[in-house]
Regions:
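Extracytoplasmic metal-acquisition and chelation regions
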Residues: 2-14, 20-307
Length: 307
């Protein structure tokens, strides 16, 4: 894949991996000299701002490539950048360091764009995966609502549903237009173009997964609830909402049994989290592993590629 590939192509790679598995039958843009200064908490939100704002906006991604966004700690300079920004795009409850910087800065409502106010959040205890009551062999319903997997909160991974990304795009267009009315037409045009690409992506997912016989996807952590809900899949996360929340021995045995019973052939890992437990499940069941990115951030190897 060429460097600087499109957002659509960048996100379609996980689509291809899902189809193969289920079977069938911290950089910023600084070209703007005097445009709005935007601090985005991590990569997906920074990318939306870049697509809408283009060269008319100065965007800072607060999460550097290779950094697990769940574990973000801000440097003093970044805290100052948040507090001096014309707009901060973030999601409350996802990155505590960003939440704290926003609160300490006493930013006005006009300076804040909280994505949690833009889209409907899923409850973390169901994680969008068990909404239809997925029954497995022997009448056992697989669930991760116990022993650390029930976080009593919401699932923050909203960006993995293209429909949510479209809503976020509209919100960014509106806020940037309020800040810089002279560029409003440009922001609107760019936002419309980006949403068209998101629509193409959604169509690709729906058509590609329509004949998928195995609807379970075993993932490193519970990042894919929105994807699963949107496309009628059942997420089976090894870890919880936080990648570091590893399963208990009983939960791991449950997942391993499920992989065997349902004939799941692929266990998905990701770039920014340890694959150790997923590798164990794959080894014990004869499944293969593949990377399914939750698109939480770029790595050093992919820093020059796009979403």
């Amino acid at each position: 894949m060429k460097k600087k590939s499109s957002a659509l192509l960048g996100v379609m790679l996980p689509t291809a991996l899902l189809l193969a598995a289920c079977g069938s039958g911290g950089t910023g843009s600084s070209d703007a000299d005097s445009g709005p200064r935007v601090a985005a908490s991590f990569y997906p939100f920074a990318y939306v701002v870049e697509q809408v704002g283009g060269t008319a906006v100065d965007v800072e991604n607060l999460t550097s490539p290779g950094t697990e966004p769940h574990d973000l700690e801000l440097k003093p300079r970044q805290v100052a950048d948040v507090q001096d920004a014309d707009l901060v795009v973030y999601e409350t409850g996802f990155q505590a360091a960003v939440d704290e910087a926003v609160e300490q800065g006493d930013l006005s409502e006009d300076q804040r764009l909280d994505v949690a106010d833009v889209v409907t959040l899923l409850d973390a205890s169901e994680d969008g995966a068990e909404s239809d009551g997925h029954d497995h062999a022997e009448g056992e319903e697989h669930s991760h609502d116990e022993e650390g997997h029930d976080h009593g909160s919401t699932d923050p991974h909203v960006w993995l549903d293209p429909a949510n990304m479209a809503k976020i795009t509209d919100a960014v267009v509106e806020r940037l237009s309020d800040i810089d009315p002279d560029q409003a037409a440009t922001f609107e045009k760019n936002g419309t173009a980006f949403k068209a690409r998101l629509t193409e992506l959604d169509t690709s997912f729906r058509q590609g997964l329509a004949q998928c016989e195995t609807r379970d996807i075993v993932t490193s952590h519970a990042a894919f609830g929105y994807l699963a809900k949107a496309y009628d899949l059942t997420q089976v996360p090894i870890a919880g909402i936080e990648p570091g929340n590893e399963p208990t021995a009983a939960q791991l045995a449950d997942i391993t049994r499920l992989v065997r019973q349902d004939g799941i052939t692929t266990v998905f890992t990701e770039e920014l989290a340890s694959p150790a437990v997923a590798d164990t499940v794959a080894s014990e069941t004869g499944a293969t592993t593949a990377t399914l990115s939750p698109i939480e951030g770029l790595t050093d190897d992919t820093a020059d590629e796009t979403y």
